[in-house]
Structures are given as structure tokens and as C-alpha cells.
Amino acid sequence: MNLADFFAKRRDQFPALQRRRNGMQSVFLDGPAGTQVPQCVINAMSEYFVRCNANHGGLFDTSVESDRWLDESHQAGADLLNAADPTTISFGQNMTSLTMSLSRALARTWKPGDEVIVTRLDHDANFRPWILAANDAGATVRIVDVHVDDCTLDLEQLKNYLNERTKLVAVGCASNSVGTINPIAEICQWVRSAGALTFVDAVHYAPHRAIDVQAFGCDFLACSAYKFFGPHLGIQWGRREILEDLLPYKLRPASDDLPGRWMTGTQSHESIVGTMAAIDYLVSIGKELGASHSRREHLETAFSAIERHESTLATDLIQAISELPDIRIWGISDPARVAERMPTISITHSKLTATEVAIQLAKSGIFVWHGNYYAVELSELLGCEPEGMVRLGIVHYNTSIELERLIAALRSLSG
């Protein structure tokens, strides 16, 4: 099957992709900051409001039906992450707020002399919460550096930091800034051998590859639905025994059972249901491509196809940008190493600021982000502050024709 044609046909399911500027369809390369949503997500959220817009735990019809949908959404989240227990899936305002909450609870177990490890490759949501928590507990923070030439983690330094005092290692599956993929399963094994816990930020990984908390061997993992074609919502998974043992900051009437003890206040039920719809949109890709039976198997089939399609687009884009004057690709720029990175390509122009490049692309109907994307430590390390970089984010609904328009627009910058 021609995957380019297969995914091009799916564009019709995304109403926003029909947007036009200057008589041409807009090109959405802003996915790393938030993807567009398919019609099925819009329908699910609207249907929730119509059918069962009620609070949790009531004995009347709409509340009972609402709770059923929420339970189904927890199962969908478990299938997405390959978690064995749906009650270990928590929903929240966003990944940042969930991480802040968890960091507060973990900090209660730390003391002076304990150590926490973070990295300069991460989004600040997987950096600052742990710094603040460690400071409150009097714990020491170790920061893993990044190889500037290809923006990969200094894994030897990470291993050397691990010792009997290490309590937690916070690391990302993939960089939201330069696309680097980290060897998560290997890192988690090192951390586990040291007797510490691992928190994994999978936000940037989620729309591109299948997440598997069992294969990763992590203790906690968080991602965001709006990065994988859903609404603005955060998702967090943790090992059941740890989630039950920790003391979260919560209100007295709130449930002490999972998942309620980690879901502060009244949730956005419509967003939770919309997240299930986004997961089932991905499932529909797998159903169309294979003969699997379970939701998880369909997801694995879908992400296998998504990875192949996006890798082809990313390889072609990296090769084309490499031939343009005045433009630098940050991170892994060898097309032969595309398997080590996400299809997220950040660039700078030697004669124009990131802001100027983004403005010119926007005038051409090409939507990209510029700045540091909250990966503050990395942007500073690379010397890209205060302007940052221009980020070109491919997801499965992008096409080679769109990338040809992008290359033409970038070429005109040096004209």
C-alpha cells in the first residue's frame, strides 16, 4: 500500500486542514505545539454535552452515562500507553499541572542528601517542577548535558550520576525542540538498577510512535492529548503500588482510590471523552491497515505505518534543507540517522531572525512555531536565545506537496 496516498485521503477527516490563505490551502507544520483534530473528536465532545453533561458519581441517568464514558476513556488511555490497569491512568488540565502535582507528592519522600537527575534536552515541564521540588526538599539536582553537535544526551554522564542517593530521573522520550529520540528502555534499566524511579515525558513522542510503559520499564509517564489529535488535556500513568503509596495534595472529600486521588477537582469530562475519540481515530488507522483484534494491536499497526510515512517525509525534508544556503538544521541532520529522531526539524537562518523567518512563512500560508518551545536549557546551550529557532513539525496528515511549498518558501528567503 502507498502510505502517502493512504494518509493523504485521511486529511478530509480534519476540518481545519481545509483552511486557505491567498487562494491556497494552509500548510500546518505547527503540530509539535498542538495538532489539528479530526471530526470524530469534535463530534464526541459535542455528543457528551448533549447526552450526559453531568458531574461524577450521581445516581441519575446522565451522571451514570457520563461515568460509563469516563471509565471507557480510562481504558482507552491504558490501551494507548499499554498499561495493564486503567485505574493507573489519570487525566488532568495538562502534562505540566500533572507533573507539578506528582513532583509535590514525591518531594514529601525526599530529604537533604537525596539526588534528582534532569536533562538539558527536556521541555521545562520536565525540568522546572523537579528543580522546585528538589529545592523544597533540600535535595541535590544533577543536570545531564547534551552533545551540541547532534543534540543527543550525554548518556555516559547520566550513568555516572546514578548512585545510591538518586531518587528520581526525569527524562523525555523525544525532544520537542530538535526531535532527538532517547533510548528510554535502556535508561530506565540503568535507573532501576540504581534503585531509583524514572519519570518519562512522552508528550512529543505520542503522535509519532507507540508508547509502551511495560516495555519502557518506567515508573511514571505523562503525555498530552492535544499533541495526538485530541483536545487540551494531560494524561499521566504510574505504577499502581507507587500511586497508592504516595500522598497527593487533594481535598478531603476526594476519593482515596485510583484514579480519583490523582485527579484534582472536577475534570473536563468532554475533553476526556474527546481524548478517547482521538485514540479511536488512531485505532481506525490500524483497522484499515491490518487484521488485528484489540485496540492496542490496532494502535501498534497504526503507529508502525505513521512512523514509516513520517520518516520518509522527514528524510526528504532534511535532504532538501541541507542543500539550501544560509540555513542550519539543529540536531541529527544525517538522513541516514532519521530513525534516531522525530520528524520535527528546527532550523536557523544566518541572515534572518527566527521571527522574520516565521513571519515570511506565515505570509505564504505555512504555519510554524519559532522560539525555544519551552526547551529553555537546550536553547541557551545552543546559543539560540533570545530568538530561538524555527520548528518544522511533520505529522501524518502532512504531504510531500506541502513540504515542496515549504522548501520553495525557504529558498526564497535567500533570493
Regions found by a protein language model. Name each.
Residues 1-415:
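Pyridoxal 5′-phosphate
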